[in-house]
Regions:
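Surface-facing alpha-helical segments and adjacent helix-coil boundary elements at the starts of domains
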Residues: 1-239
């Protein structure tokens, strides 16, 4: 597989895609993106750059269609492009973007789809619009789909790592703690990831919930992730 490392080359492909779109329509644009980017080895940062550039000239009312077709290819890079474009739509279309992200996550049916889209859409929404996003995440926690529940932990990891305020980090910890009885391995990894990150960056939150964490009802896998996070906090402080 050809590897692409140049932003200049990405710009050239995008310019070709734009010209094809203007002259022949959306289908021609999608062919250029598929052949020029998705079938090549392109880093996630370069794909995010491409998504930002595309969002500048693809009209808002056509963007969802373009994302749907790209994601339908099931190429890993398509989820980065779609995730980034949905992220850019969050200020105006927060709920719609989260709903579409969840549809991509369920349809993708792979852990990496959950993590790629979850971080870029739900995680960024939590970081930038916590008061609006947290109620949506609480609602998603009731879903039966394992990927939707997993993405709550993924979103928490992303937002806390990016400096989500302690107030909202604590709210998210309570939500993760309520999911600590999970038995599915994919859910456990996502929820545990979020809990571990909170423990690393906000050990005081963990101490406030120590009694609940130590209850028999709280599974050992959850407590183990907390311990790992606290140990990483100690290591970071010692450096």
């Amino acid at each position: 597989m050809e590897k692409m490392t140049s932003k200049v080359r990405v710009r050239e492909i995008l310019e070709q895609a734009k010209q094809s779109w203007e002259q022949q329509g959306q289908d021609a644009l999608l062919v250029v993106i598929f052949e020029g980017l998705l079938k090549k080895k392109v880093s996630f940062p370069l794909l995010e750059f491409a998504a930002k550039e595309m969002a500048l000239w693809i009209p808002e009312d056509e963007q969802l269609y373009v994302m749907d077709i790209l994601v339908a290819t099931k190429e890993m890079g398509s989820y980065v492009l779609a995730g980034m474009m949905l992220q850019l739509r969050l200020p105006l279309y927060l709920e719609e973007s989260i709903q579409r992200a969840c549809a991509y996550i369920v349809g993708g049916d792979q852990w990496y789809v959950c993590d790629i889209v979850g971080e870029r859409v739900l995680g960024h929404a939590l970081l930038t619009y916590p008061e609006k996003t947290i109620p949506l995440l609480k609602h998603l926690a009731q879903y039966s789909d394992k990927w939707i529940v997993r993405t709550i932990g993924v979103a928490t990891h992303y937002a806390v790592k990016k400096d989500l305020s302690p107030k909202f980090a604590e709210t998210m910890f309570r939500l993760l703690l309520s999911l600590s009885d999970a038995t599915d391995s994919h859910i456990k990894k996502g929820i545990g990831w979020g809990a571990k990150t909170i423990a690393k960056f906000h050990p005081a939150i963990i101490e406030r919930y120590r009694k609940q964490i130590d209850l028999r009802e709280t599974k050992q896998w959850f407590r183990t992730k907390i311990t790992i996070g606290l140990n990483r906090n100690k290591v970071a402080k010692s450096l």
